[in-house]
C-alpha cells in the first residue's frame, strides 16, 4: 500500500531505491515471477473528502516501486444496501465517493497508457449496492480494464458478499479477472470458488495472531477446514498497561505479579517438556491471568464470567497442544513459545505460522474445487 502513514521517509526512500520486491524481501527465486500488487491504503484517508493521492502520484509510485499490478485510487463506500437504491436516493457524500472513484479510474488507465507504465492496471470497484457495484464494474471494463479490484468488502457479511459477486459476475465479461480487496472472511474462502476469483488479499491470518480475543493460532482441521486456538496470555508484568496501572494505584504488588508471571512461564515450558500436567499448568496461567481481568474491570460478576471463559479456552489449547502437531518452520524452531501471547516477536511469529497454515488451506480448497 502507498499509505504514507506506514513507513518512515528513510524506509520509503529505500523502498523506491531498491524496489518493493527487495524491500519486502520477496525477491527470492521462488517469488520472482509472482504478483506484487500496490494499492492506495484507502482506509488511511477514509474520513477525507477525497482520496489522498492523485492518479498521477499513484502511477508514478507503482512504476518507481516496481509493482506488477496497481489499483486505481479509490474512496471507500462502506454500506451495501441490498434494496439497490437509485442514484437520486443515496446520500450526496456516497455518490461523490462513487463518482471520484470512477473518474480516478479513467484518469489512471489513461496515464498508464500514455506513460507505457510497466504494471497491469486494476480498476477499483466501489458502490452502495450490488447493482451500483455491477454498474461500476461495467464502466471500468468500458474504460479498458481487464482486472477489477472489488473494494468495500471488509465490513460486509458473507451473505452480502455473495450477492455482490453474483451481481458483478452477471454484469461483466467471463474473462474479466476479479481481485477481492481486504477479504476479511478469509476462513470462508471455500464458499467463493464459483465466482472466477483470480486473487484476493487478507491480513486476517496475521492480525488475528495478536488482535483476536480467542482465535490466535490457526491449525488444519481433520475435517478439512481450519481450527482456531487461543494463545496463552502471559504478558510482561512491568510492560502491560493494565497491570502497570494497577501497580500505580496500589491494587497490585509489582514483586508479586513478576513472581506469578515467572511461575506461569515455567509451568508452560515444563508442560511442553512433559514435566507438568495440563491441570497444574492451567492453574498457574490462570493465577496470573486473573490480575489482567481485575485490572480491566471492577465488576466482580463480569470478572468471574471472563475468567471462566478464558479458562475454558486456555484449557482446550493445553489439552490439544496444537504447536506439537505442527511441523511448520516457526513451530519447529520455537516450540511452545509460538503459543505464548507475550512480546511482539512471539506474536509476529504466530502470525507467520497462521499465514503458512492458511496458504495451505487455500491451495487445498482450490484443488478440491477443480
What are these regions (language model features)?
Residues 28-30, 115, 172, 320:
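A generic structural signal for short, solvent-exposed coil/turn residues
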Residues 16-18, 55-59, 89-91, 140-145, ...:
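Short, low-complexity, polar/charged sequence segments that are solvent-exposed and flexible
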Residues 214-370:
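C-terminal accessory extensions appended to soluble enzyme cores
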Residues 4-5, 42-44, 75-78, 128-130, ...:
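Short, solvent-exposed loop/turn segments at secondary-structure junctions
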Residues 1-113, 269-312, 366-370:
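Non-catalytic, usually N-terminal nucleic-acid engagement modules in DNA/RNA processing proteins
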Residues 71, 124, 329:
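Residues in well-ordered beta-strands of folded domains
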Residues 32-33, 66, 117, 144, ...:
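Residue-level preference for short coil/turn positions at secondary-structure junctions
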Residues 115-285:
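Glycine-rich phosphate/ribose-binding loops and adjacent secondary-structure elements
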Amino acid at each position: 500500500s502507498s499509505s504514507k502513514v506506514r513507513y518512515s521517509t528513510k524506509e520509503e526512500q529505500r523502498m523506491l531505491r531498491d524496489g518493493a520486491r527487495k524491500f519486502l524481501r520477496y525477491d527470492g527465486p521462488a517469488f520472482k515471477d509472482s504478483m506484487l500488487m500496490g494499492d492506495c491504503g484507502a482506509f488511511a484517508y477514509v474520513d477525507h473528502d477525497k482520496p489522498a493521492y492523485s492518479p498521477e502520484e499513484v502511477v508514478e509510485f507503482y512504476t518507481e516501486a516496481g509493482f506488477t499490478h496497481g489499483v486505481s485510487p479509490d474512496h471507500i463506500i462502506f454500506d451495501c444496501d441490498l434494496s439497490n437504491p437509485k442514484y437520486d436516493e443515496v446520500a450526496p457524500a456516497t455518490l461523490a465517493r462513487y463518482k471520484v472513484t470512477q473518474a480516478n479510474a479513467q484518469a489512471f488507465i489513461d496515464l498508464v497508457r500514455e506513460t507505457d507504465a510497466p504494471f497491469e492496471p486494476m480498476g477499483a470497484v466501489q458502490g452502495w449496492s450490488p447493482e451500483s457495484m455491477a454498474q461500476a464494474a461495467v464502466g471500468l471494463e468500458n474504460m479498458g480494464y481487464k482486472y477489477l479490484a472489488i473494494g468495500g468488502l471488509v465490513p460486509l457479511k458473507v451473505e452480502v458478499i455473495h450477492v455482490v459477486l453474483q451481481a458483478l459476475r452477471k454484469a461483466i465479461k467471463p474473462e474479466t479477472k476479479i481481485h477481492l480487496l481486504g477479504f476479511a472472511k478469509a476462513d470462508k474462502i471455500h464458499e467463493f470458488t464459483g465466482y472466477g476469483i483470480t486473487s484476493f488479499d487478507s491480513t486476517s491470518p496475521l492480525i488475528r495472531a495478536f488482535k483476536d480475543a480467542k482465535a490466535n493460532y490457526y491449525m488444519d482441521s481433520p475435517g478439512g477446514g481450519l481450527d482456531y486456538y487461543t494463545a496463552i496470555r502471559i504478558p510482561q508484568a512491568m510492560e502491560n498497561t493494565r497491570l502497570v496501572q494497577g501497580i500505580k494505584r496500589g491494587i497490585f504488588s509489582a514483586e508479586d505479579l513478576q513472581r506469578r508471571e515467572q511461575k506461569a512461564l515455567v509451568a508452560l515450558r515444563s508442560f511442553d517438556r512433559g514435566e507438568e500436567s495440563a491441570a497444574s499448568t492451567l492453574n498457574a496461567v490462570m493465577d496470573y491471568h486473573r490480575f489482567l481481568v481485575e485490572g480491566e474491570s471492577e465488576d466482580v460478576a463480569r470478572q468471574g464470567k471472563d475468567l471462566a471463559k478464558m479458562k475454558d479456552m486456555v484449557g482446550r489449547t493445553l489439552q490439544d497442544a496444537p504447536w506439537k502437531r505442527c511441523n511448520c518452520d516457526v513451530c519447529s524452531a520455537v516450540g511452545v513459545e509460538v503459543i505464548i501471547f507475550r512480546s511482539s516477536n512471539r506474536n509476529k511469529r504466530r502470525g507467520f505460522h497462521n499465514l503458512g497454515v492458511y496458504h495451505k488451506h487455500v491451495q487445498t480448497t482450490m484443488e478440491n474445487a477443480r
